[in-house]
């Protein structure tokens, strides 16, 4: 049963107020300030304006957001579900408050019909079937906002910053219904996108290129939301220079050992994006690395894949590829290492700024055979346009 629009809006208003009070309380607890980068030699090279920007990424504020988004109230954020709809409204409210421009077909939303998507996946010809048109639409939404660039020559090129905001929802078992809250997977990525959007939007001087902040529905159903965007891009693919997708950055208890101040990149050496993030890590004290197995293995397992298939140099960053509560009921918000999460998000912020302010765009590695299909897609897109 779905909430009526008015009831949903009222519920969201009340919950947003409650959440912001909670976030403020977390930030003020024990007079804790937002984390700052330690004054190392490498950190000293960060421009003051950029340093001020990344210092706005607060562990305590992110704790407040995540404790709501991964709460039982959102019922595990299945696609589609009431909880997912509520989260979409919440993300849009954060984008609006940050001052991002709405660029979807419905404000901050890129809307799709879940029933049509399901029919098309079962039968590619079903989308043209008259019977499909008689099924009532079931709306699902990517949430998207943009920070326009400042350079007249580069502002019409785009850097994507993404995460998925869905999870597994409620599932039945022999012991009753269980809620899968998905704090690390991927409320951590969603909150990171919100934090990055807020930080960049507060900059006194915007980056040269435009930065698009987007959260996808349906990743757990097979990268559905990101594939929908790839097929229906809001911004020209040939003008989209890179994508950084944020997935599972909250937990440090990887099954291979603790991953503190560590950030892995999928397809690390497929393009120059991995090296750009690694360079950012030198300034923040975060080890950015290629996992010998999982870097390549998981390149196709998250939403970056749908963008890479279009030729965009897009990669996913993660702290823990595998952790004890992965796709389990124990993936709760109180198991997140928020200070570490803020530190890695600052690293991502520096990488985004580097790409957004560089006249040159990241390239696929033509010498790497694993990148060949993506390079071919990029070349084909340039030829067509």
Task: Locate predicted features.
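His/Asp/Glu-rich mid-to-C-terminal helical/loop segments that flank catalytic regions of hydrolases
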Residues: 202, 324-385
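Second-shell loop/turn segments in exported
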Residues: 48-56, 72-82, 128-134, 174-186, ...
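Zn-dependent metallopeptidase/amidohydrolase metal-coordination segment
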Residues: 294-344
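Metal-dependent peptidase/peptidase-like ectodomains
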Residues: 216-316
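Bacterial N-terminal signal peptides
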Residues: 9-20
């Amino acid at each position: 049963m779905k909430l009526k629009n008015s009831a949903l809006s009222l519920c969201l208003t009340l919950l947003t107020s409650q959440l912001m009070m909670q976030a403020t309380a977390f930030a003020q607890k024990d007079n804790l300030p937002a984390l700052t980068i330690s004054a190392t030699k490498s950190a000293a090279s960060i421009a003051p304006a950029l340093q001020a920007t990344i210092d706005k990424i607060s562990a305590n504020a992110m704790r407040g957001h995540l404790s709501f988004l991964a709460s039982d109230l959102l019922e595990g954020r299945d696609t589609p579900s009431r909880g997912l709809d509520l989260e979409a409204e919440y993300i849009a409210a954060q984008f609006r408050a940050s001052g991002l421009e709405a660029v979807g077909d419905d404000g901050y939303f890129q809307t799709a019909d879940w029933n049509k998507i399901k029919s098309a996946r079962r039968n590619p010809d079903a989308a043209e079937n008259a019977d499909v048109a008689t099924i009532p639409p079931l709306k699902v939404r990517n949430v998207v906002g943009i920070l326009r660039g400042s350079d007249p020559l580069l502002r019409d090129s785009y850097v994507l910053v993404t995460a998925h905001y869905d999870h597994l929802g409620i599932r039945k078992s022999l012991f009753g219904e269980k809620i899968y809250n998905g704090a690390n997977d991927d409320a951590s990525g969603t909150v990171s996108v919100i934090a990055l959007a807020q930080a960049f939007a507060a900059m006194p001087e915007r980056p040269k290129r435009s930065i698009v902040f987007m959260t996808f529905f349906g990743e757990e159903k097979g990268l559905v939301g990101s594939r929908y965007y790839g097929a229906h891009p809001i911004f020209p693919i040939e003008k989209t220079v890179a994508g950084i997708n944020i997935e599972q950055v909250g937990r440090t208890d990887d099954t291979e050992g603790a991953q503190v101040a560590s950030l892995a990149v999928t397809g690390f050496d497929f393009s120059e994006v991995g090296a750009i993030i690694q360079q950012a890590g030198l300034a923040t004290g975060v080890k950015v690395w290629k996992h010998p197995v999982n870097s390549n293995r998981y390149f196709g397992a998250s939403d970056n894949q749908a963008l890479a298939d279009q030729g965009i140099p897009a990669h996913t960053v993660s702290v823990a590829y595998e952790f004890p509560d992965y796709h389990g009921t124990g993936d709760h918000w109180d198991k997140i290492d928020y200070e570490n999460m803020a530190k890695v998000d600052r690293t991502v912020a520096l990488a985004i700024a580097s790409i957004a302010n560089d006249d040159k765009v990241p390239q696929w590695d033509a010498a790497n055979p694993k990148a060949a299909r993506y390079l071919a897609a990029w070349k084909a897109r340039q030829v067509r346009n």
